[in-house]
């Protein structure tokens, strides 16, 4: 799955001063940042802010109306999206990397998962297989499904096929949101995802 590591910085420097910050890297790409101060530990960071893919949650009507939400995270990373969870929310996360899966739950490194305000279930497996099992089990559909598995060097194309997209929509509520994070240093995924949107008449 490539080299992963956590970099510790202090207020944006390495001089040991300021606020301690942990940054999660996979290769040369930073996939998660946490401010290691209690009053700031649940602050969404990086591309998970309300101005990034976090808007799929933050901008949802149920979030604004303080109603319970069900959120599925495909590509757990360090679980930054759990920062949005509230007491009655349910979050489900998938990841295929044993190292990433373990690190996300190590509260010495990151606490988004361990200190999550809502209920969190995590699975170390291929997300598509896990979702197929959820569908077979008749789970309650989700309000938001966020696919964040395409930012690395190796693209899991089976998570972007028509069959995969069909699966996501089967597991979404009628007013649900499907968010696909397409940032990638090597490939331009926008045309492909745009075609999917047109095919499904998504606005």
Where are these regions (language model features)?
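Glycine/threonine-rich flexible loop motifs
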Residues: 152-160
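Short SAM/SAH-binding signature in class I
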Residues: 140-148
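Conserved S-adenosyl-L-methionine
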Residues: 202-203
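A short glycine-rich, Lys/Arg-flanked "PGG" loop and its adjoining helix->strand segment in the class I
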Residues: 160-174
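Short "lid" loop at the C-terminus of a central beta-strand within the Rossmann-like core
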Residues: 151-152, 183-187
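Conserved beta-strand signature within the Rossmann-like core of class I S-adenosyl-L-methionine
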Residues: 175-182
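Receiver (REC) domain switch-region micro-motif
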Residues: 71, 145, 178
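Class I S-adenosylmethionine
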Residues: 1-120, 124-137, 155-156, 187-196
